[in-house]
Each structure stands twice: as C-alpha cells, then as structure tokens.
Amino acid sequence: MMTHWPSPAKLNLFLYITGQRADGYHTLQTLFQFLDYGDTLHIEPRRDGEIHLLTPVTGVENEDNLIVRAARLLMKVASESGRLPAGSGADISIEKRLPMGGGLGGGSSNAATVLVALNHLWQCGLSIDELATLGLTLGADVPVFVRGHAAFAEGVGEILTPVNPPEKWYLVAHPGVSIPTPVIFKDPQLPRNTPKRSIDTLLKCEFSNDCEVIARKRFREVDAALSWLLEYAPSRLTGTGACVFAEFDTESCARQVLEQAPEWLNAFVAKGVNLSPLHRELL
C-alpha cells in the first residue's frame, strides 16, 4: 500500500487579469505547469473514523488546515453517498518544502493530494470530476492538482483546458517574504483589463504576469530577486508571489546560476512537468 504521496509545486507560466466580477473575484487567463519538486504527505489509514494531522503548521489551527478540511470533506461526501467504508480515517503527516504565500500552490496541492490519496486508500470510488468539484470548494487552484495535467485556466481559474507546454528547467527563488493573495488583488493599481486571447495566441506570445508589477512595488525583496534573476535568463513572478523563477533549457545551465545565488535567497532547481508527480505515481 502506498503511504508516501507527492504534493508537487506549480508555476504560473503566465498570468493575465482580464476583469473583475461583481462579487469581487477576478477573472484571469493563466498557464499552470507542475514541478518535479514539492511536499510529501505520509498517509496511514485508520479504522476508527478519525482524522489526525500529526505535523501541525505554525500559525494554522489543525481544523483550518486545508489538509484536514480536504479529508473531512471527502469523508462527508463519500459517507452521504454511501461510498465510505465503515471506520475510514487517517493519520496524516507532511514533509514541508514549499513556502506559504509563495505562489507555488503548496496548500492547494496538499488538499488535492489528500483528496486523491484518501479516495484511493479508502476505496471510495469518486471520479476525478467529482474530486475536482470538491476541490474547487476548497480553493480555485485545487482542481488543477486533482486533475494532474498542465492546463490553461480561465474564469476565476476553474475552467481548465489540458495543454502541453515545453518542459523546461527552472530556477525557483523565494525572497524570504510571504505575500497573501488579497494584498495583490486589492491593490488599486493592479491591471484588470488585459484583453482575453486564445490559447494558441497566448502560447506564441512572450509570457508575463500582471501581478508582478504590484509585487515588485510593494515588496522590495521580490524586486531584488527578480532583478538578480533577470541578469541570467527570462524570469517572472509565479501566481501572486512571492516566488520568482527563471527558465533554462538544461539542468546544468540552471544549476550554474543557482551556484551564484546570493545568501539571502532561498532557491532550488526543478523541472517543469506536464503530468503531475502525484498522478505519475498512480499509473
């Protein structure tokens, strides 16, 4: 029985804000790709119907943690539909490598891994579509991790079209700050009227991120990290930050730059992959 479950990072290879709805949510167009790097969840089934998170996250109550919320949500829905074997529960612990507030999707990825893993371990039999629908109630980025394939996203991020962008090597850098998403989306200077374009058009254009100008303006650490990376390769913000990344054609080129990273920058090299490491394990 598999007990170690990948919870990979994602990059937004581009991110454009195309509008704002009456409910305050922003509409966007973005390109998600996974990294062969991330957290690892250790999940052991229990037979007493209890969910225990054995590695609490500092500053987050266990019941508020997306890991626990995802487990309880699956338990509730599977139970109500008669698909939860009696006594199903789990002990869950996490090896955390992805920073909070980094734009790498750590919390969303954790939630998706829990949904996929427990559906498998408990033998609930929910489809990927059902799991993705559950995931959306936990966060807009959860469905792409549940579905497990690189995707072009529209709407508020919930309309996904599978795509296969080039699988490049990336140097990903965390500048030491955490950026809450609302800080970026509430900024009055955030571009909110980027024209909508087709997938084909966007894939042929130079990639960029509408949130980058705000993150650089408000967080000097992000600005400094991007300024350094741009000396070596095309670089930009992922999500709403704080992580930034540079793209390379080979691992060796990325690692040569990593060796020159300033001490204040926490950085790693990873490959972009179109099939999630989580789903690769399940094949």
From Swiss-Prot:
The active site is at K10, D141. Gene3D superfamilies: 3.30.230.10, GHMP kinase, C-terminal domain. One of its GO terms (molecular function) is ATP binding. ATP binds at P99, M100, G101, G102, G103, L104, G105, G106, G107, S108, S109. Belongs to the GHMP kinase family. IspE subfamily. Homodimer. NCBIfam families: ispE (TIGR00154). This is 4-diphosphocytidyl-2-C-methyl-D-erythritol kinase.
